Amino acid sequence: MTEKIGLFTGTFDPLTNGHLDVIKRASQHFDQLYVGIFKNDQKNPLFPTDKRVEMLEEALTSLSVTHKVKVIKHERDLTVNIAKKLGVTALVRSLRNSQDLEYEKNMFYFNMEMTGIETIFFLAKPELEPLNSTRMRELHAFGQDVSAWVPENVSRELRKLDEKK
């Protein structure tokens, strides 16, 4: 039987409880789930890539899925190219709302055309729908406490950033 290998990518800057929920749920459907922290040249990161990897790996220890989940990072390549190199059988994406659906439908088309790799979509739980990294960065920049929406270790790192100001 073919091993089921998934790939869930993002910038995770910062990691949210919504991201963790998708990772936990997706890991139940794969023998191996890669979580790729990728650089996005169109975003100005709050945390360097290595720090985001460290925070994600620490947050994953609370989920009891570390035996199935491997965090990887990549600076410059298409997700589908990385997926082919890793032998991925399906890409994992999360949908929070209709805007996500429209964006992901377009990506699905090109990913399928270029590689034939399927995409599996996970709907965000209703209580996690509003969460996204951009909103967390914005709220944090204006001095708001985001600890209810991010893992504890991420909240701690955000407080450290505040102390450096």
Swiss-Prot record:
Binding site for substrate: T11, K43, T79, R93
Enzyme class: transferase
Leader peptide range in chain numbering: none
EC number: 2.7.7.3
Compartment(s) of residence: Cytoplasm
GO cellular component, one term: cytoplasm
GO process terms (BP): coenzyme A biosynthetic process
Pathway: Cofactor biosynthesis; coenzyme A biosynthesis; CoA from (R)-pantothenate: step 4/5
A Gene Ontology molecular function term of the record: pantetheine-phosphate adenylyltransferase activity
Keywords: ATP-binding, Coenzyme A biosynthesis, Cytoplasm, Magnesium, Nucleotide-binding, Nucleotidyltransferase, Transferase
Cofactor: Mg(2+)
Site residues by UniProt (Transition state stabilizer): H19
Entry protein name: Phosphopantetheine adenylyltransferase
Organism: Lactococcus lactis subsp. lactis (strain IL1403)
Gene: coaD
